């Protein structure tokens, strides 16, 4: 059966929309438990993977590049598991490290769904709708609390509001940080691309009221990178811009530039100290073999037994240079495929390529690339840029 017949199934399409809506709006995905620890996100994942296996068996389309990434990724996970058993990792910590990484296998489902111009447009539509919802709700919340003072919701810095840790007080007035807020700068970029400047301004205002330096940097980088890419600037210069932005961020941290006003007094000393201690403990435990393949899942450090703040540090500790090389290769593949798209779909490729770069950049500070929040937009960028670069596979025919 040809692939287009499979994606013509309206129920599969509607399921895909529900999955994307949940991914973009519900942050970590832990706030909608169904039964026995199963959440809506993981239910969607299992359905999506099952559908993708069915599509793979019935379709005559075999994406060799994507399958190669899946095989290498699987090899990584197997090595991580073997090392975990060699070093007798605690099962609880092992699963905490391993479970989020499974979400990578949704990539094949995304591939088989992104088969038309309008399907890709729907992804952007759903993303921007979710950003609008987050923007409006957060601005209403901040207006009622800090602006009008009708009620107050204050807490200590980085104090979790809920059990899942999806919401945290910032320590500045009633401001909150929500894990899904990483999509606010990406949404602002989408509004800029689509010339929806009112929504762009509102989303930027919401970003301001998060009092989160990383989101400010992400917003500035995303807008500048997208502008440069759509104005024929070489992609290597944009990657260089990523490194410059990262350097400037660190300089700003040292000079306390973000603390020129009481509004920006985030009191990040404790959080920064945890990062530095974690880095030191990770490097203290490097051996010749861990340098290559890591210590395996479930092997943390005293400061962070699981889930290190910096994604790349977490990947390096558990999977070594082999693990980091995989994500570097994926990053290069996204740039390669996205940069090869010319003509009609150039701006679509530029948007998703920039969104992926924003996630890769933010993962220098927070754990995004190695969980479903960041992995989803990165895999969508990979698949969509791959699709758009393959003229023989992509069609503008609507299946929506």
Which positions does each model-derived feature cover?
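Hydrophobic alpha-helical segments of polytopic membrane proteins
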Residues: 2-4, 187-254, 341-344, 350, ...
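Aromatic-anchored transmembrane helix interface
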Residues: 42-43, 68-78, 89-113, 126-131, ...
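Alpha-helical transmembrane segments of multi-pass inner-membrane proteins
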Residues: 124-152, 170-228
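A conserved mid-to-late transmembrane alpha helix and its immediate loop/hinge
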Residues: 304-340, 361
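Transmembrane alpha-helices of multi-pass inner-membrane enzymes
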Residues: 352-360, 368-400
